[in-house]
Amino acid sequence: MTLLAAHLNDAGLLITDGERILCREPGYALLKDDGLVTGREAWATASLEPRRTKNHYWDDLRTASLADARFQHLTAADLVSRQLETLWQRVAKPGDRLALAVPGYMNAENLGLLLGIAMDLDIPVVAMVDAAVAATRRQYTNAVPVHVDLSLHSTMLTRLLQEGQAQFERSAIVDEAGMLDLYGIWLRMIAESFVQQSRFDPLHTAETEQMLQDRILDWLAIASTRETVPIEIEYRGIAHQAEISSLDFVAAATPVYQNIVSNLRALYRAGETPALQLSDRAARMPGLADTLKARVGGAVFLLEAGATARGLVQRCVESRPGSAVTLARHLPWDQAPVSVDVGGREAAAQPTHVLLGNHAVPVGGAALSLGTQTSEGERWLDLGPDVPGVSRLHCDISTVDGQCVVTDHSRYGTFLNGHRIDGSAVLQTGDVLRVGTPGVELRMIYVETTHGT
């Protein structure tokens, strides 16, 4: 009669008893002629039979029929039910109970349906906790923690409160920034390297494409520890080889990483020190931790494999028999706190000017106010009298503790690289600042000054 914990992230559905990882597999389903299979078996043939494969059902858990003609007799709930049943039968013994760590991409409707599926399968679910909260087992003194994890199709960023325990505050789901998005980028890069170095295109056939997919995690591990990655696949008795710089993996992923950075920076207010807590999945992505450290600042903490489920099984508060299971968004810490150096806030270049159209205005010295109505005695960037979505005093840009900071004063919002800020945010060179909705866009730039005699 053991308490087990499951982390239901479709990039790696995982169950643990607190000591061992009992199973881990991706959220993949394959409709074969003789039935439905899920997990590793479906992943192993995803490139060979793409039209028979589904991987979007955990993050789109519904009871509507699937659109694909081959799957019209099934729903996403059917696929989740089959995979959950298979996992439970593989690891559970009579009398075992299950606690669920659920990812941020699952909404209240998804969670209600998930609990219904578990009930139909006679799986005794005794607790359900936000995954980021379950993963956060210690206090980050002098800092604000954000948990970073990747699913198949998105990156999940969760900002946590630290009022005596780990507590959910708010989150951001970054679409098109998941494991499969990164895999696709890297597989295309690897294929191009084969073409250039050995005149062999591994994406020409489904069989060799599947070979690349099967080996991608091994190559990523090498890219995280060595300067170059030797790559070899054998096809029809011939070995094909290529060598890729590890930095090329990071460069190829830059658009995805930058999207994550932009969303992450919008979660922090000016003056806050980030404590970036990365899941082992996020930590395995070449250059991601270093990119976040360089562009967001603060300190980076890397979690071990299975940390979310282990953190849940050790701290779980089980529901009373007969009572309904509801989503918990707070748990006590059970590990010693760690102190974060407040000096590591930002490392990126600080802007010197804000550019509106073709007009650049310095942002050093006294605060620069932005809005539709000037105020006597203040530095003012007039955005015009009739700009929709812009307040009279919308925001201001000032230097605070050596950082360039935007502070929002509006009803309509101030947006940093497309994401609404929460009160204030630190600005960097290259940032796009949108004032209001639809509002006005401005760019933060660095102007180098030269002094001669």
Where are these regions (language model features)?
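Phosphate-binding glycine-rich/basic clefts of nucleotide- and phosphate-handling proteins
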Residues: 160-245, 280
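Forkhead-associated
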Residues: 359-445, 450-452
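Active-site neighborhood for divalent-cation/phosphate handling
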Residues: 75-141, 162
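Conserved phosphate-binding loops in N-terminal lobes of ATP-dependent enzymes
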Residues: 11-101
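Regulatory inter-domain linker segments that are low-complexity and enriched
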Residues: 55, 67, 325-339, 436-453
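Gly/Thr-rich phosphate-binding beta-strand-loop-beta motif of the actin/hexokinase/Hsp70
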Residues: 1-25, 29, 138-169, 186, ...
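Helical "lid/coupling" subdomains associated with nucleotide-phosphate turnover
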Residues: 222-335
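Acidic, glycine/GT-rich loop-and beta-edge segments that sit at the periphery of enzyme/chaperone cores
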Residues: 300-376, 382, 388
